[in-house]
Amino acid sequence: PLHGSSAASDVYKRQGVQLWKFDDVKLSLLNTFNNSNAYESEGCVFDDENQKFFISEENKKGVIRSYSLTNKLLLDNKFRIDDRDGNITGDPEGLAILKTSKHEGFLIASSQGSSTFNIYDRKHPHQFINSFNIVQNSSIDRVTDTDGIEIVNKYFNDTFPTGIIVVQDGRNTGENTIPKENFKYLSLDGLK
């Protein structure tokens, strides 16, 4: 529905979701969606090829939902992917898509309270597959209290030839001298 334009969204914790369109340097508000059932919306990601929009909601509910993006740029067909009665053990936060083909791949959700990442099928009904955590090695400390994730699954540079995973780490632990939150950059090869 965006006809080759770039799009972005804003998710307000207890309010609406805004859909924006970028054309060169111009930014236009296309639509605002009422996310009335959300207690505290956190992360979001578009799946362009499958016309899906995913939102995570933390605190009381701990839910990940998918919506279909219609040709009129409306969010429709709300579907509950997972919640704390299922496979979510902390607050669902960041969301990212790992594409394995045009329409297939995985939805990855970071969980702040449990410092884990859940893997779901990219296609409806978004079946839970597994979870993982990022452990300490000779280069980094364990990722804890994570609030976000992003994945690029194509050549990034010689250090990340098959792609890169960027995760927010709430605090440094172990022998690290920097105690503040930071970002970890990991090779996509480590997830395969």
Please provide the spans of the model-predicted regions.
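Short loop/turn segments immediately following the C-termini of beta-strands
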Residues: 13-14, 56-60, 111-112, 168-170
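Structural signature of eukaryotic scaffold interfaces centered on beta-propeller domains
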Residues: 5, 42-50, 93-103, 148-160
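Single conserved hydrophobic/aromatic residue that forms the stacking wall/gate
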Residues: 1-8, 12
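Conserved blade-ending motifs and adjacent loop-strand segments that build the rim/top face
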Residues: 81-93, 127-155
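Loop/turn-rich, solvent-exposed surfaces of beta-rich toroidal or solenoidal domains
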Residues: 86-132
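Beta-rich catalytic cores
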Residues: 40-42, 60, 91, 113, ...
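Short loop/turn segments immediately following beta-strands, especially the blade-tip
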Residues: 19-27, 66-74, 119-127, 186-192
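Blade-level signature of beta-propeller repeat domains, shared across WD40, Kelch, NHL, RCC1
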Residues: 148-192
